[in-house]
Each structure stands twice: as structure tokens, then as C-alpha cells.
Amino acid sequence: MLERLNFIENKYEELSNKISDPSVMANQKEWQKLCKEHADLEIIVNTYREYKKAQEDLESDKEMLKEESDKELREMAQEEIKELTLRLEDLERELTILLLPKDPNDDKDVFIEIRAGAGGEEAALFASNLLRMYTRYAERKNWKVETMSLNATDIGGFKEVTVAIKGKGAYSRLKYESGVHRVQRVPDTESSGRIHTSTATVAVLPEVDDVDININANDLRIDVYRASGHGGQCVNTTDSAVRITHLPTGLVVTCQDEKSQLKNKEKAMKVLKARLFEAAEAERAASIAEDRKSQVGTGDRSERIRTYNYPQGRITDHRIGLTLYKLETFLDGDIDEVIEALVTEDQAEKMKDLGRVN
């Protein structure tokens, strides 16, 4: 590990020199690429330097113990040795995590697709609860939320809705939300007070650049039509709504949120690219490790990941067996406690994999 850390530190110094070179700065595209690489290494280098400093201090204190006869100074050195030993253990763990293979999509913006599942109108209302939860979470993170497409019901639910969430680390946090979410509660329309179980499916897709995926224009069928609102009534007198079908896969994306047909087409294309990229990534991951099932979950949208139980005020994440009794604040966007636990479990799984490889 130390050999790799020394290499990273040297690389960081090399990049520091490059990004301050006027000749490199003249090429803005290359300079921005180098700046990003430099920023990615910074936390590793800073942690490694802190680790080296703690090691030096530890050796210094050990030397003092050998040479010092003063009782008070020896006790101080022993106390410092104890603290530094614990600190070095913590820093070593931090460095191990920082050196784990990074998901190349972690820094990307995301699309979140929420679809009502089993449960009719109640499932559609639950889909709207989930949308609000992610919107409130994004607000806490100072991320931007943009509606891409939606299919609303008459009572305020959503049959399906897609939003873009833009901000630093959006995918790295939200990627764990893909899967089936289950709600247990008494619907407002239920006169007997019987608890119903409904579901909604969430898919989290990283936004992709044109370089990440190439779409042949001949593989697309683009239809335009008039946008409709609740209950199907027409809300636009022009054909501004857009439906794009990717013929080889049968994937269909619609967008009618904007008044401009061009803007709707741009939005629909972004979502289509993200879906195609996700499908390609899933296929690649399956071929690499088809027998590995991560304890954190596969990210498969058919996997039941979480239950929201209203009578008990309970949320249970089935992937890690975590139960919290804070349903109200959780649905108000306070979801970091679960996400942190999922991140920790994911890192532990990666460390196990690394150990098997080594």
C-alpha cells in the first residue's frame, strides 16, 4: 500500500506543476481534465501526509522514552504514543478506503425514475411521497432538481415521474436507492382502517456524456403529439410532447414538461442515453461477476430494498437489516443515516473483494 501511496503523491506533485503551467492552461479542456485528476488525488495525498507525520511523531516519542529519565516527560511521551498509535490505525483504515476502486459514475448527476407498482392509486400516492423525499434530500444537499417527465393521477399521485438531480456527489449517494420500495399504511380511502401494502419502483441512472454512449439516429423513432394534463385533457395547442423509441431495445422515453418541442426532445434524449448506459453497465457487471451478489444489493430495480411502515413509524432497509423509527423525518429527506450505512457496507464488501484478489 505504501508503494502505491508514494506513487500517488508523486503523481499529485507532477499534476500540481502542470496545472500552474501557462502553456497547459492555454488548452482549457486539457487543463480542466488535469485539475479534476489533481482534485481527486488531493484527499488521498493529504491523508497520507498526515499518516507520515503521525509516524514521525511516534518514532520521536519512542526515542524520547529510550533517552529520557524524567518521570513526567516519560509519562507524556507514553500518553502521546498511545494516542498516535490509535490515530495511525484510523488513518490506515481511511487510506485503505480511499484506495478502493472508485465508481467512475460517482461524480455524475443523476436521473431518478419513480414508477407506481402494485396498489393502484395508493401506489401512485406513495410514488409522490418518494419524489418529495428525494426532492427534500436534494435541498438539504443544495442540489438542483429538474422535472423531466411525469404522468400524474387525479388525486395527486404519480403513475411515473422522472427528475434530474444535479450536484456534487449526487450519484454516489443516490445510487443505493434503486429497487422496489414498499409501503404499509391505511389509505385515506379505506373506511375499515385496514392496512394496505403498496409498492413503487425507483431507478437511479447516472447522466452520461456523448462520449460515454453513441446512439445511431437510424435506431430512433421520434413521435410528437399534444401534451395532456390530469385526466387526459389537452393542455397545449401545439405538438410539443415528444416520444422517442429506441428500436433495437424497445426502450421508450416521453417528455411533455416543456412548452417547446425542442426542449422536450433534448430532455427525452438525455434520459434515453442514461437508460441505455445503465443497461450496458448492468450487462457488463453481470458478465464480470454473475455469481456475486453484494450484501448492499445489486441495484436491480426488481429487488425489494426497503419497507416504510406507517403504523409503527418504521423504516427497514432489507439489504443491511437496518431499522429506524423516524419515518416522518425520513420522508422529509433525512435519509443520510441509511445512506451512510449502505456506503459503509459497500466499502466493506469491496475490501473483502480486494482481499480475495490479493
Curated annotation (Swiss-Prot):
Cellular component terms (Gene Ontology): cytoplasm
UniProt xrefs under InterPro entries: PCRF, Pep_chain_release_fac_I, Pep_chain_release_fac_I_sf, Prokaryotic/Mito_RF, RF-1
UniProt subcellular location: Cytoplasm
Keyword terms, alphabetized: Cytoplasm, Methylation, Protein biosynthesis
Modified residues (N5-methylglutamine): 233
Taxonomic superkingdom: Bacteria
Record's comment on post-translational modification: Methylated by PrmC. Methylation increases the termination efficiency of RF1.
Primary site of residence: cytoplasm
Gene Ontology MF terms: translation release factor activity, codon specific
Family statement: Belongs to the prokaryotic/mitochondrial release factor family.
PANTHER family: LD18447P
Protein's job: Peptide chain release factor 1 directs the termination of translation in response to the peptide chain termination codons UAG and UAA.
Protein name: Peptide chain release factor 1
Origin species: Clostridium botulinum (strain Kyoto / Type A2)
Annotated gene: prfA
